């Protein structure tokens, strides 16, 4: 039991928050027409990547998800990437 707690404590210390990709590129407003940016937030299977994977804030994640859905409706992005 003690070993598990030590292992968990070590993992929590070494874990760093992910860098925000939108902030790094200087993007304030996510646009559905910017499909090159939106492709970074879609997995190879066509799923929208989670916040934990992308490092976005909750508000940015909602904006990206909405933009991806709009881009799919406008046929700028595929619904699946097979």
Curated annotation (Swiss-Prot):
SUPFAM superfamilies in alphabetical order: Ribosomal protein S18
One GO BP annotation of this record: translation
Any Pfam family: Ribosomal_S18
Species annotation: Corynebacterium urealyticum (strain ATCC 43042 / DSM 7109)
UniProt entry keywords in alphabetical sequence: Ribonucleoprotein, Ribosomal protein, RNA-binding, rRNA-binding
Protein name: Small ribosomal subunit protein bS18
GO molecular function, one term: structural constituent of ribosome
Top-level taxon of the source organism: Bacteria
Family: Belongs to the bacterial ribosomal protein bS18 family.
NCBIfam families referenced in this protein's UniProt entry, alphabetically: S18
Subunit structure: Part of the 30S ribosomal subunit. Forms a tight heterodimer with protein bS6.
Entry-linked InterPro entries: Ribosomal_bS18, Ribosomal_bS18_sf
Stretch list, region Disordered: 1-25
A single Gene Ontology CC term: cytosolic small ribosomal subunit
Function noted in UniProt: Binds as a heterodimer with protein bS6 to the central domain of the 16S rRNA, where it helps stabilize the platform of the 30S subunit.
